Amino acid sequence: MGKRILVQRRGRGGSQFRSPSWRREGPVRYPPLGTAGRGYVVDIIHVPGLNAPVAKIRLENGLEFLNYAAEGLYVGQEIEIGEAASPKTGNVVVLGKAPEGTMVFNVEKRPGDGGKFARSGGTYAVVVGQKPEENKTIVRLPSGRTMEVDARGRATVGLVAGGGRIEKPMVKAGKKYYRARAKAWKYPLVRGKAMSPYAHPHGGGSHQKGGTPVSKTAPPGQKVGFIGSRCTGRGCVRARAQQKQ
């Protein structure tokens, strides 16, 4: 008798697969639209599961919110937010008011969504240009892709602190374990071909062998490995590279 494979168990959403959100201070997002004024950095904290430091900011009206800390931000620094905010490191500006060439992070895709782009440690986006007639701002994302976003959206000036974190090696498997635990990742991951046949479609046999591509319409439990792929192997990669050229 077979058993449910790992991807099926993960899809069910058991407690061991859920992200431990109760360990976090709260959502990292901007205050409601229309919020403007000055504030200051109350504290810079570490939040389990996030790969960048988080700044706790308190505004003049008493409202507090969490935002990713900019490189060089310090406790007690004055922060401006709104249309009148100057493009200084740590300030939350409206994209339509940001000068061309400004480095920003935690960029909103739609006004009021709290920030969607450039949120990882050490990343930033660049304001490339403005389209006032269409109320759009052109932003170059960390991937190099340019995107038009609503000019009424907000972003923080600077780059996210915590850059270079991936340059430090893990060294021990135990560190990887605790990193995965903070993010609710399954660790260690066992290869399907190393399992028994009752546990995975790639398991079993007197020797290990690769699986075959699976149809997109295959039922859950069969959908592992290459799903609906047109071609596989080294020749496939070469063919795609030639097509791009």
UniProtKB/Swiss-Prot annotation:
HAMAP family: Ribosomal_uL2_A. The gene is rpl2. It holds the Pfam family Ribosomal_L2_C. Coiled coil: none annotated. This is Large ribosomal subunit protein uL2. GO terms for molecular function: rRNA binding; structural constituent of ribosome. One of the primary rRNA binding proteins. Required for association of the 30S and 50S subunits to form the 70S ribosome, for tRNA binding and peptide bond formation. It has been suggested to have peptidyltransferase activity; this is somewhat controversial. Makes several contacts with the 16S rRNA in the 70S ribosome. GO terms for cellular component: cytosolic large ribosomal subunit. Part of the 50S ribosomal subunit. Forms a bridge to the 30S subunit in the 70S ribosome. Residues 196-226 are annotated as: Disordered. Keywords: Ribonucleoprotein, Ribosomal protein, RNA-binding, rRNA-binding. The keyword Transmembrane does not apply. It comes from Pyrobaculum neutrophilum (strain DSM 2338 / JCM 9278 / NBRC 100436 / V24Sta). Belongs to the universal ribosomal protein uL2 family. GO terms for biological process: cytoplasmic translation. SMART domains: Ribosomal_L2 (SM01383), Ribosomal_L2_C (SM01382).
